[in-house]
Design a protein with these regions (language model features):
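Short coil/turn linking the two alpha-helices of tandem helical-hairpin repeats
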Residues: 4-12, 23, 37-48, 77-83
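Short coil turns that delineate tetratricopeptide repeat
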Residues: 27, 62-63, 102
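Terminal, low-structured helical/coil segments at or just beyond the last alpha-helical repeat
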Residues: 84-136
Length: 136
């Protein structure tokens, strides 16, 4: 995994290969799935591999505290308008933070600032339902 993270900025292709290798060895590693998502979706989030990798990161480690913030920030930037599964993951993650992990609300604020318009509306709706305000 270390190779994938170190290559992510300079060589997405090398990072993709490193994360793919890691997943062959450990297919339930949420961190490897999370790394594969930006490596394969750098320029095209409609890329099925990127969105599948992001989903697998959630499915294999939804509550991994080390991934909650960066994964939420990445998900907020993705075009979720054509993928109800990603919308559901965004809603569930925000709701979980509001109800069970208030110490991570800062991550929601960060995600909100970089979110697409559609994802901002989703985040706003979750906070409105909880009768809370979105953190700065």
């Amino acid at each position: 995994l270390r190779d994938g993270w170190s290559e992510l900025q300079s060589s997405p292709e090398a990072a993709e290969a490193a994360f793919t290798r890691a997943l062959r060895l450990s297919p339930m590693d949420a961190g490897a799935w999370f790394g594969l998502a930006p490596a394969t979706g750098r320029f095209d989030w409609l890329n099925p591999t990127a969105s599948k990798a992001l989903k697998m990161s959630y499915y294999t480690g939804f509550n991994r505290s080390d991934l909650v913030a960066p994964r939420l920030i990445l998900l907020a930037q993705v075009d979720t308008t054509r993928d109800v599964e990603l919308v559901d993951l965004l809603r569930r993650q925000v709701r979980l933070i509001i109800t069970r992990a208030p110490e991570l609300k800062g991550a929601v604020g960060q995600a909100y600032r970089v979110a697409t318009d559609a994802n901002r509306r989703i985040i706003e709706a979750e906070f409105k339902d909880a009768k809370q305000s979105i953190p700065e």
